[in-house]
Amino acid sequence: MEEVTLVITSCGRFDLLKRTLDSFFEKNTYPIKKIIITEDSTEGKKLENLISQYENKYNFCLIINETREGKLKSIDKAYNEVDTEYIFHCEDDWEFLKEGFIEKSMKLLKEEPKLLTVGLRSKKDFKEDFFMKEEYVSKDGERFYEVNEEIYTYNPGLRRKSDHDLFGSHEKLKDKLYEMELSKFYKDRNYRTIYFKEKYVEHIGDKRHVHFSRKGKNSILDFKIDRMVKKIRYTFLKLFGKVK
């Protein structure tokens, strides 16, 4: 059986991270060799306290940034620790809804070497022109939505470590629109991305986006103030049913 590492990028939203982990553990049905979590808030103790609820059941590797370094450096640190053929990449603000997403994704990646990843979000989350008009058809006849241009995403999805290694470090993208740059890189090499027609995940981080300035100092105090304000606003919006 092919081995899979779960990589999660986190930054101080521990309530959302707990929902992400709980739903993943409930819905995932494929063995995970190791779970790597990078924490960019510098609040390692809080992460360790959360993970202590699970550590006797799963093999965790926690990477705590001593200063805020941002998503790209965090991804590089995590992927440097991966020793499996496949990576299930995730962020700290997703809820998993259905079982079988890793097995089904792996089957598709095995049958098509140029398939970059299989998306799990609903088609309704995207603009009308995000997907091609012509659908992707697998070898067993199942139909999927195929992405038009933005084929690279940090949203939840299974991917090959070898495909990541083609590009290398993501930190070199720090002054660019990184998902667009990565999409162009892989599209130029004839990669494709498809999405299931059924929804497997729900984004739960609306209104809780983590601020990281590409040019600013990104102090811990600024981060904590920004996090507090967004969490208060999110709590009120959730109370009135405006967010999930």
State the predicted function of each range.
Residues 3-5, 34:
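Cell-envelope/extracellular polymer assembly enzymes that use nucleotide-activated donors
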Residues 13-28:
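Short, well-formed alpha-helical segments that are part of the catalytic scaffolds
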Residues 19, 149-152, 156-162, 166-244:
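C-terminal catalytic/acceptor-binding lobe
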Residues 24-63:
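Acidic donor-binding segment of Leloir-type glycosyltransferases
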Residues 66-81:
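Glycine-rich, basic loop-to-helix element that forms the pyrophosphate-binding segment
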Residues 85-95:
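Short beta-strand-to-loop acidic/aromatic patch adjacent to the donor-nucleotide binding site
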Residues 99-117:
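Conserved donor-nucleotide/metal-binding helix-loop-beta segment in metal-dependent transferases, i.e.
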Residues 118-131:
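Short beta-strand-to-loop element that shapes/binds the nucleotide-sugar donor at the catalytic cleft/hinge
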